Regions:
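Intrinsically disordered, low-complexity regulatory regions
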Residues: 1-131
């Protein structure tokens, strides 16, 4: 998997470059053209990220910190939870248990599914490369 946070000059992939055309060996150069820009989510969607973090905090307090990662059949079960919150969000705005927005619960579950899928994929790639 590509590491979007890697600031090294790659030689086996696309050549990295400064978005302003500054030579990599000159002061002020930063080889980040074309790299992932986390600020587009963290700054531009700060309210949504905080709402999802509230769901994560609620879950950690109700269960355990990070315990969601060890739920059996997590992808399937978090998908079901995501769908439940989507359906309930059409009927009511807030989850009665947490008092938080169903949309925030839906987003948290979508992120949990995505995280588990990406981890599975990484494990498959690691296994394949180590034979």
């Amino acid at each position: 998997m590509n590491d979007p946070f890697n600031d090294t000059h790659e030689t086996s992939g696309p050549i990295e470059r400064d978005p302003n055309g500054i030579d990599p060996h000159k002061p002020g150069a930063k080889l980040d053209a074309g790299k992932v820009r986390p600020s587009l989510i963290l700054s531009d969607m700060a309210r949504a990220i905080l709402a999802v973090a509230e769901v994560g905090t609620f879950g950690a307090n109700k269960y355990t910190d990070g315990g969601w990662q060890y739920v059996q059949d997590g992808i399937k079960r978090y998908r079901d939870a995501m769908d439940r919150h989507r359906l309930l969000g059409a009927i009511e705005e807030r989850d009665p248990d947490s008092g938080l927005l169903h949309a925030a619960h839906e987003a948290w579950n979508a992120l949990a599914v995505l995280e588990l899928m990406l981890r599975e994929k990484e494990a498959e790639v690691r296994e394949a490369s180590h034979g």
